[in-house]
Amino acid sequence: MTTAPPPLSVLLELTHRCPLACAYCSNPIALAALREEMDTAGWRSLLEQAAEMGVLQAHFSGGEPMLRKDLPELVAHARALGLYSNLITSGVAGGEPMLDQLQAAGLEHVQLSVQDVDPAGADRIAGYRNSLPKKRDFAATVRARGLPLTINAVLHRHNAERVPGMIALALEWQAERIEVAHTQYYGWGLRNRAALMPSREQLMATIEAVDTARRELGDRLAIDFVTPDYYARQPKPCMGGWGQRFVNISPRGDVLPCHAAETIEGMRFDNLRERALADIWNNGEAFVRFRGTAWMPELCQGCPKREIDWGGCRCQALALSGNAATLDPVCERSPAHAQVRATAEREAAAPAPEFIYRRPERPAPATADTLE
């Protein structure tokens, strides 16, 4: 039995149910049904095991975590265990009563997704009507309660020019931080890649907009920026390194090294109903497979950045090359690098196809009762 340093944070994907139908959704193609979700006792046990391991942060996500009626109980349990609690939400499924319960339970931070500052654009990408006003009202409710707020703004070819407006919105909504992140093409988002891929010119404009805002705003607003991998020369480290800093729990209780790991066919993922979290983290097949550097191909082994980017993203290597154990094709040392860049340029230059939604009818506003 081996022992790895404990993860810094655990992401609890409480449910895959969600009012939105975002074209860039990174959740798996096959979603967990309501009847498959882990029960309250299972999630409480997970939090206890995480705290015992030395985990510091618990991020409550989904789907939409506010559709779980036991969310306040789980947040309170995390607080009692000394875990920092963060809510990652769409902001359209929970109102003041739920937020009051979460604040009373000890919630410490809220991350709110914003699809666009243009109302029509926001509704189109989210597949949900009147989404932006609902998010604005939710943000006001969060700030009225004194909770710290981060805005998560996802970029693509249809909204890349509106980065200045997104930053202005974060200031108007009194957020402390905004994450301006280009779409990462995993899960359902990969199906819509051709509809979402920005041009290189759009990318450079977003970089300039972020740099300008950082200079002008100083410490008034923290701005994080994530570029699209397809135009990069160096890969990003997968979650800070596969199986090193982060652990993801699916609604079914499967323990994953990263959000998209289930796309890797043939890899076995242990479940909390059958095995303890610490044992899975230290010895589970999925975590050991790509942890560290021993698994790396020769080109990675000789790279001075091998313990910086850790070989890049395993799920992306699979998606773009068909082999999860090879170099991330984003890396300029990869034989497939030129093909990745060509794919991005070709798709960005072509007319954007229509979005493919999980629910093809582009749903009307949903309720918890309709989201099984």
Swiss-Prot record:
What's the record's note on cofactor binding? Binds 1 [4Fe-4S] cluster. The cluster is coordinated with 3 cysteines and an exchangeable S-adenosyl-L-methionine.
Return the PROSITE patterns for the record.
Answer: RADICAL_SAM
Q: In which pathway does it act?
A: Cofactor biosynthesis; pyrroloquinoline quinone biosynthesis
- Reactions listed under catalytic activity: [PQQ precursor protein] + S-adenosyl-L-methionine = E-Y cross-linked-[PQQ precursor protein] + 5'-deoxyadenosine + L-methionine + H(+)
- Looking at the record, which segments are called Disordered? 342-372
Q: Is the keyword Oxidoreductase in the record?
A: yes
Keywords in alphabetical order:
4Fe-4S, Iron, Iron-sulfur, Metal-binding, Oxidoreductase, PQQ biosynthesis, S-adenosyl-L-methionine
Q: Which residues form a coiled coil?
A: none
Ranges of residues in domain Radical SAM core = 4-220
What the entry lists under InterPro entries is as follows:
4Fe4S-binding_SPASM_dom, Aldolase_TIM, PQQ_synth_PqqE_bac, PqqE-like, Radical_SAM_PqqE_MftC-like, rSAM
Q: Name one Pfam family in it.
A: SPASM
Q: Which Enzyme Commission number(s) are listed?
A: 1.21.98.4
One biological process term in Gene Ontology: pyrroloquinoline quinone biosynthetic process
Entry keyword annotation includes Metal-binding: yes
Cofactors (names) = [4Fe-4S] cluster
On subunit structure and binding partners, the annotation says: Interacts with PqqD. The interaction is necessary for activity of PqqE.
What function does the entry list? Catalyzes the cross-linking of a glutamate residue and a tyrosine residue in the PqqA protein as part of the biosynthesis of pyrroloquinoline quinone (PQQ).
Entry's family note: Belongs to the radical SAM superfamily. PqqE family.
The name on file for this protein is PqqA peptide cyclase
Q: Which organism is it from?
A: Xanthomonas oryzae pv. oryzae (strain PXO99A)
Whichever gene encodes this chain, its name is pqqE
